[in-house]
């Protein structure tokens, strides 16, 4: 668990390094989930740099042979040896258009964020998935 805490602190530092504190916000939801509210116009560039930063910073958590192999073997929670991929960052984005903000409630926004994160995590390795509410024809689903 100590190593996991180090990784979370590393991620938090990478997040803080890539935001503009006068326009952006970083929050820790829990576990390995963080929330970014980005008001910066160059948010896409910032997120791409964040992916690079985190990838580079994570190298210190591995031995050379792990980096070369692209994975490592460790005991899983059941005590069995298992191959694990190297750490990667998955970012789910909800790009909000001001007109859509007035029609979304908190549960709809949370659902969109959950969907974006889900799609980002489906990709192997570092990824960003954007749900763009500025896209023509975007209609939020009714809250269930």
What does each of the following model-derived ranges do?
Residues 1-16, 20, 27-31, 35, ...:
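Conserved long alpha-helical elements within nucleotide-processing catalytic cores of c-di-GMP signaling
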Residues 14, 53, 57, 119:
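Solvent-exposed, charged/polar functional surfaces in cytosolic regulatory/catalytic domains
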Residues 19, 58, 114-117, 121:
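Protein kinase-like catalytic domain
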Residues 22-23, 125:
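A short helix-to-beta-strand capping loop
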Residues 28, 62-115, 127-134:
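A short glycine-enriched loop-to-beta-strand structural element that forms part of the catalytic core
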Residues 33, 42, 99, 135-136:
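Conserved nucleotide-binding/hydrolysis micro-motifs of P-loop NTPases
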Residues 33-68:
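Short helix/loop segment flanking the catalytic signature motif in cyclic-nucleotide metabolism enzymes
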Residues 116-144:
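Intrinsically disordered, glycine/charged-rich C-terminal tails and inter-domain linkers
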């Amino acid at each position: 668990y100590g190593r996991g805490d180090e990784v979370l602190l590393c991620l938090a530092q990478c997040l803080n390094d890539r935001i503009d504190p006068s326009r952006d916000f970083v929050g820790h939801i829990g576990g390995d989930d963080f929330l970014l509210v980005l008001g910066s116009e160059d948010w896409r560039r910032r997120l791409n740099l964040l992916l690079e930063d985190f990838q580079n910073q994570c190298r210190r958590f591995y031995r050379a042979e792990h980096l070369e192999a692209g994975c490592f073997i460790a005991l899983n929670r059941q005590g069995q040896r298992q191959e694990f991929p190297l750490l990667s960052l998955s970012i789910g984005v909800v790009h909000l258009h001001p007109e859509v903000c007035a029609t979304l409630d908190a549960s709809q926004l949370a659902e969109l964020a959950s969907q974006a994160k889900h799609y980002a995590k489906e990709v192997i390795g570092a990824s960003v998935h954007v749900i763009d509410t500025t896209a023509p024809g975007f209609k939020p689903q009714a809250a269930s």
